Amino acid sequence: FVGATGAGKSSILNLIGRYFDIQKGEILIDGVNIKDIDTDVLRAAIGQVQQDVFIFTGDIKSNISLDNENISIEDVKRAAEIVHADSFIEKMPGGYDAPVTERGSTLSAGQRQLLSFARTLAYDPTILVLDEATANIDTETEALITSALAKLMEGRTTIMVAHRLST
């Protein structure tokens, strides 16, 4: 979806995740009305990368895996490699065990966004939602993400939200 601020792009995403009830019409996923899908099941299928990234106190590894025991260190490293976050992670003292402060204050905006992409990819959702995911990052990081998008979207329903068609 592309549109100006206030056009309803984020509202559509909230409808897809069933955070709001649909008043008219229906939204189908693989031909199934989302009202017929258990809310927890639906939301578990959606991986979202937003404009504003939340980074947790801990380490790089836990910020990608969110300490989910089903996500191995190999999954974390594979996800980081696909989104090109591995290049900065491996340069950090401690690599994937490098400490991260609250909100990732020691990381650049681009590095935080790459971690968010890696986090979503490690989770392996069937539906990928990119909500202004490249809006506040530098052109170099945007180029890294753009080069990884084909792999990120492979085998997934992907919904992209942007203010400009170029993003």
Which functions belong to the PLM regions below?
Residues 1-167:
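ABC-type nucleotide-binding domain
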